[in-house]
Each structure stands twice: as structure tokens, then as C-alpha cells.
């Protein structure tokens, strides 16, 4: 880390006008080799050609530098100029991020459309990521004479009705406050604070920049103990993730990865969402832009877009920018985390990012590893996922925040032995494996309950004990029933259902009830698109209560399963209808009433 920071500090050495211009030596797709580049640094941002195409130095050899260009390189000639900026690729962080849609290197797409009038991004366009003309009401939080350090909150602005943005001192900056602006309306161009540092006075604005490849510093990482509620019953009950966790969603084409990612964006208990469309179809980002403004948060009239940042790097955009889009997204997420928010970042899909790495690696003639991917694929993925976590933020007042990363993986043909999937599974703690067969049977979410897993149960046990002590037992029994059903399915195919014992017949029918009326969920219906955790645990409680009573009647009272089913037909039908109960104030009384009916039926039947 120290070497990276030192390199970053050294990038600014030398005045821009004194730097020697480089020249284009060769062009191969998005990879450009420049000569006469003595003094340049790794990951320095450069402008290539007369149109000023943005690029980043990824390899240095004597006076030659290899540059990956984030725009279309057609039309570049040998001998064209390369202008060094002396800075790494940075993200602009401040008020105005929400409700925006950016490309992979944080250029605002709406503003580009308005300025150019076309539907494609012009070459060399240079529009700031944050609107410099928009006014915000600034409320100072420090006074002149106070000493501040990196991460301290020195003011706040109300960005919209959902978000209050804290204005932070950039990390690595500190000093005595010489001037602080009074409460009032300011733009991002206005100086709102001046610091007296060892090098003289330094002006502070409401925004600052940060290199996308360097993780933002924190006070300390802490153990994540609060669940990330998704509104999907199978995820919240059987395979939960924590706020600050890492999750992979691998699945073949058409299995529903994007729908799950979008459901998380719409309904999860996160304060902010950063949705990165990396190399996926443009229609998916269009869907998000069309649907999200209509959705509201927590029953209020506020659009869900007010807490969402979109980074769109679709499949028809330059390949090199895919790599940058993931880093841009995680840097924005870390900045929002430093505000004290719980942030969810959706990366859809990391496979396309890995394919971009493979293409660049091939152009550099690096030694390929498995399936042509570079040997450092695992290290790059690990570095990205390690930026997730629940943390104590830098500076004062004390704040805690988290970044949860949900990475969709698109293995070719749904093959989970694909190098990207294998490398991802070695890093993440939660695996939501999508099954093509379930998707073909129209069972959605098509998450395979036998393959998927979560390693966060021990972290979440204290939370579950506090909310519902019986939930852990019910969940374990549910997993056992599904596992036994999987074992019995082969026997049924061989000898038929009649050869099974009464308990085994019960297990088959209850597992069918669990799969069709608990795990299956219609994401496009009003009653089932979102299921709160209270409804999830009460539904599971009622199913397991019915199972336990039925098993007791078979074991101790020697009743047949067909007799029990006939006698309890009404409550069994009630269990099947539970998912149609709307998530309102009548929900708990209705599900508790069904519980009492189940207990009453068995009490009457068994005397």
C-alpha cells in the first residue's frame, strides 16, 4: 500500500507545461504504445491524439509506455501526441452523485447527450462528473480555529429528500481551519473552507477526487452482524448475506441473474445502491432507468433513484473501460460508506470484466493461464472483493458504514468450473448458484438450494436469537427436508411413491409445499415481489409446525399420511395461500391465526 501511495504522490511532480509530450509508436485495438514517455508513472492518466482520448498507463519499458485507451482508437496515427496529466484515474466524490448515470470512467451520460445531441458518446468529450452549476444549501459543522484531519465532517448538504450528504475532509489532508463558509447556497466551484497546513493555505470545496485503484483509508474493519435483507424468501431464510459481505450469483444465460440484482437494488435494506452494468446488454440499463423512477422507498413517495448511482458500461462501449467501471463503482461505494451509509454495490457482470482483462492481456502478449485468462485474474478479483466490509469510518464524529458487493458471474453454458467462477468462489462468503433446469421449469428465483451456501450464519445467530429464537431451528429443519427430498427423488423414480414409508411420503409433500409456495416467488406481482423478513419467518414457522405435528401423528399415533392430509385439508390449503397475504398491518394477525388453526386441528384430531 505504501508503494502505491508513494507512486501516487510522485505523479504530481513536475509542472504540466514542462513535461515532454510523448508520441504514438503503435496502435493495437484499445492498446497504444507511446514513445518518448520518460518520467511517466504507472496508472497515470494521459490524453492520446488530437481528440484527447482518455487512457491509462499499464506498462513501462525504458522510454516506452503501454496505454489502455478508454475510447475508440480508430483514426489514431503513429506520431500523434500523447499528453500526460500527472494524475491517476480519479473519481469525483461529492454532492450530486445520486440520480446520475455515468460511463465506465465517470463521464455523465445525460449531460453528454444534452451537449452533443447524439445517442453515442463523442470522442475526447470532457464533461465534469458532478454538476458545477447546481446550488446546494451548505450547513457548516466546524468553526474557524478548529483542527481537522482526513475523514472529518466539516459540513453537510441536503442532496434530496432521502439523502443528507456529509462534506468530508479528503483523506491525508489535515490542518487548522482558517475560514469556513456561513450557512447558505453554494455551488461546487465555491470555496467552503480554507485550511492552514505546513505548506500554506489550502482551499477546500464540497467535492474532492480520489484514485479509483486505491482503497479509501478506514479506522478499522469490524465484524458484520446485521443481515442484508433482500425481500427474496430463499435468500433471507436459507442463504443470508450480511451488510458488508461478499456474494456471487453465477448462472447461465436466462437464469435470472439480472432480475435478482435489480430486486436487491429495489428492495434491500441498504441506504444507497451503486449499480454497475459492466459489459452487459444496454437494454438492461434501459430497464433500470425506466423502472426505478416509478418505484418508491419504504412506502414513501420518494423515487428509488434518489438513493441510486448507475455506472453503465454496456457491451457496445470500449472494452478497456469495463475494467475501470468496476473500480469507479467501488470507489463511489467507499465514499458513500465513509458518509456512514450501508451501501450495496451490484456488479453485473464480473465475467465481462474478466473478459476485458483477457483481451488486454492478449494484446500485451502476456502468458495466458486457464481458458486464456491472465494468471493474475484471481489476484485482481480478490483485490476488488476485499474492498467490501463493515468498517469504522475515518475521522470524527464516529461513524460506521459498510459496502456489500454482489457480483453476478456469467459462466459460458452455466459451467461452474469456469476460471472466473472458480476464482470468485474462493473469495466470496455467499454463493447463490442459479440452476438452468429450475429456470426452464419457470421456478424463480432459480437458486439451487442444494448447491448454494452462506458462511455468515455464525455472524447472524445473535441477531436471529434476538428477533425470533425459533427461526434457526426452523431453518435447519427446512434444509433437512429439502436434502431428504433430494435423496428420496431417485428412489421414487425407481420404485414409485407407494413403496415409501408414511414419514417419507410426508417429507415429499412438505418439500413440494416448501419449494412451490415458500421458495418460489413471483417478482412481477404486487403480493410477492417483495417479502419482508417477518413474513418469511412466520411462513416458515407455520410450515415447520405443520410438519412436526404431522410427523408426531405418524410416529406416535400410527396414522397414515393420507388420513392426516384429508383431515387437515383446510389448513394445508391455508399454508399454500400464505404467500398471497399482503405485507401490511394485517399480515402478522393472519399468519398467527393460521398457526392457531394448525394447532387446533391437530389437537382435535389426536384428541
Swiss-Prot record:
Enzyme class: translocase
Source organism, top-level taxon: Eukaryota
Known catalytic reactions: ATP + H2O + 4 H(+)(in) = ADP + phosphate + 5 H(+)(out)
Keyword presence, Transmembrane: no
GO biological process: ATP metabolic process
Alphabetical list of InterPro entries matching this protein: ATP-synt_VA_C, ATP-synth_a_Xtn, ATP_synth_asu-like_sf, ATPase_a/bsu_AS, ATPase_F1/V1/A1_a/bsu_N, ATPase_F1/V1/A1_a/bsu_N_sf, ATPase_F1/V1/A1_a/bsu_nucl-bd, ATPase_F1/V1_b/a_C
One function term, GO molecular function aspect: proton-transporting ATPase activity, rotational mechanism
Gene Ontology CC annotation, any one: vacuolar proton-transporting V-type ATPase, V1 domain
Chief place of localization: membrane
Annotated ATP binding sites: 251-258
Subcellular location, record wording: Vacuole membrane
Keyword hit for Nucleotide-binding: yes
One Pfam entry name: ATP-synt_ab_Xtn
Membrane topology field: Peripheral membrane protein
Assembly: V-ATPase is a heteromultimeric enzyme composed of a peripheral catalytic V1 complex (components A to H) attached to an integral membrane V0 proton pore complex (components: a, c, c', c'', d, e, f and VOA1).
Designated name of the protein: V-type proton ATPase catalytic subunit A
Provenance organism: Encephalitozoon cuniculi (strain GB-M1)
Gene coding for it: VMA1
